[in-house]
Design a protein with these regions (language model features):
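Extracellular LysM carbohydrate-binding repeats and other cell-envelope/extracellular binding modules
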Residues: 45, 50-83
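Acidic, Ser/Thr/Pro/Gly-enriched interdomain connector segments
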Residues: 1-44, 81
């Protein structure tokens, strides 16, 4: 079990959940500029998550890790991603 909670994503993760994260971050100005929606949690995505956490004062997750606190903050600022 991940200490940051179920559904936590971090560098090295892949899949549709990562793609959704990438798509949501692209909607926040200047956080993930020109970022890929490849479904791969790479160093660029880690930096974008860390930037989002810093800019919005999210402290409940490790820096660059998409845990429960970061997920809640991002989802509250972006509409659901349509498949």
């Amino acid at each position: 079990m991940d200490p940051d909670g179920a559904g936590t994503l971090r560098e090295g993760a892949t899949g549709p959940e990562v793609t959704e994260l990438q798509q949501r971050l692209l909607r926040i100005p200047d956080v993930y500029r020109d970022g890929a929606t490849s479904g791969s949690y790479d160093p660029t995505l880690t930096a974008a998550v860390a930037r989002f956490q810093l800019w919005y004062g999210i402290r409940g997750d490790e820096t660059g890790v998409y845990g429960n606190d970061t997920r809640a903050a991002l989802e509250s600022r972006t509409a659901p991603v349509s498949g």
